[in-house]
Amino acid sequence: MRIKRKLTAIVAMAIIGAVGLAPMANAATRPTTAQKLQLQYLVEEEKLARDVYLYFATNVTSYKFANIARSEQTHMDLIAGVLKTYNYFNPTLTRAQGVFRDKTLQSLYTALTAKGSTDIWAAYQVGVEIENLDIGDLQNMLDDAMPADMKYALDRLLNGSINHLAAFSR
């Protein structure tokens, strides 16, 4: 009886180890240098979405933009938490609305706010563009091994962006 219990316990431990710990063995314990740069870009990309939506909430007046801008702030906070965990610089901390460290995002902000200012439908189309951009970037990042906290944050952002895309597409 004792031998059977011990054998069952050993087999159970082996199965748990093989199934439960195998994914952790492949997960990175710290973001790579490339992932660090991607996170820093991503937090600014989320700021771009938030700032464009805040601009439209004021100038185009649709409740969707105000609601989704709040969600984008949550996305920024989530990525800011990951950056803080690894003591990485957050490029959005001292930036005013519509001001970006990344020059490409700065140009994109100017172009998108102008493009979406013509009417509500143009603004919604800009929302679709932004969310498609976010989704593509997030899917590319999620293809790589990464720390669990980073994967969790990116998965949440991806789900949020999919929901935002659906809201702007209605």
Residue ranges and their predicted role:
Residues 1, 27-28:
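Intrinsic structural disorder
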Residues 1-11:
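Bacterial N-terminal signal peptides that target proteins for export
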Residues 17-25:
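C-terminal segment of classical bacterial N-terminal signal peptides
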Residues 28-170:
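All-alpha RGS (Regulator of G-protein Signaling) helical domain and cognate RGS-like helical scaffolds
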